[in-house]
């Protein structure tokens, strides 16, 4: 089964601010989710409905936070950012699980 991969508008705005090589690496890594939506680790606490896919680019750890909608066979990327900033940015976006 192949899932549809969507990027939430707030995530897209922040994504476009990243350097092109980082964008390309994040897009390539996110493609895994189409066939394996459970590839990322489940988050805990207030973001327990989100999952996080980890990758390292040029020595910097990045996270792709996403939500899986099984019935619709859809994945929505909520945010892609460096590990050090992702939870602060999720809080700023006021995402509700």
Residue ranges and their predicted role:
Residues 1-29:
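Arg/Lys-rich, positively charged N-terminal/basic patches that mediate binding to nucleic acids
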Residues 9, 47, 79-81:
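A general secondary-structure junction signal
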Residues 19, 26, 37, 90-91:
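Short, flexible helix/strand-to-coil boundary loops that buttress conserved ligand/catalytic motifs
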Residues 29-32, 83:
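Conserved short hydrophobic interaction patches
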Residues 31-58:
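A short, surface-exposed loop/turn module that caps and links secondary-structure elements
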């Amino acid at each position: 089964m192949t899932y549809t991969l969507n990027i939430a508008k707030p995530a897209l705005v922040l994504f476009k601010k990243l350097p092109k090589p980082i964008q390309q690496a994040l897009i390539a890594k996110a493609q895994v989710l189409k066939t394996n939506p459970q590839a990322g680790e489940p988050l805990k606490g207030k973001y327990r409905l989100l999952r996080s896919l980890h990758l390292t680019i040029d020595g910097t750890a990045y996270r792709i936070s996403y939500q899986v909608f099984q019935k619709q066979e859809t994945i929505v990327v909520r945010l892609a950012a460096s590990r050090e900033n992702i939870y602060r940015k999720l809080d700023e976006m006021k995402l509700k699980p």
